[in-house]
Amino acid sequence: MAKLSLIEREKKRAKLVAKYAEKRAALEAIVADQSKSEEERYEARLKLQALPRNANPTRQRNRCSITGRPRGTFRKFGLARNKLREIAFKGEIPGLTKASW
């Protein structure tokens, strides 16, 4: 089980990403737009840099929703590999079966 502080930190990052998503997208569009003047693009870059670091989605880490484990997490289920295995063997995930060929 991951430390509770690490799990809470990730939740805080997720909130910040959601809060600044529109603003970040607008600024990134201005920076990428070649038709804008150099000065406008520079100002947009400065505003983008002024946003909180944790508002950047690349700083988020996918964690298991049960244990908080940061590695070996399946995006589709939001679970770590070992918890996914336990739950799948109990038959609690509909349509998920062990591979057999």
UniProtKB/Swiss-Prot annotation:
GO biological process, one term: translation
Gene Ontology cellular component terms for the protein in this record: cytoplasm; small ribosomal subunit
Record's keyword annotation contains Nuclease: no
Sorted UniProt keywords: Ribonucleoprotein, Ribosomal protein, RNA-binding, rRNA-binding
Record flagged with keyword RNA-binding: yes
GO molecular function, one term: structural constituent of ribosome
SUPFAM superfamilies in the record: Glucocorticoid receptor-like (DNA-binding domain)
Subunit structure: Part of the 30S ribosomal subunit. Contacts proteins S3 and S10.
Known function: Binds 16S rRNA, required for the assembly of 30S particles and may also be responsible for determining the conformation of the 16S rRNA at the A site.
Family per similarity comment: Belongs to the universal ribosomal protein uS14 family.
Name of this chain's protein: Small ribosomal subunit protein uS14
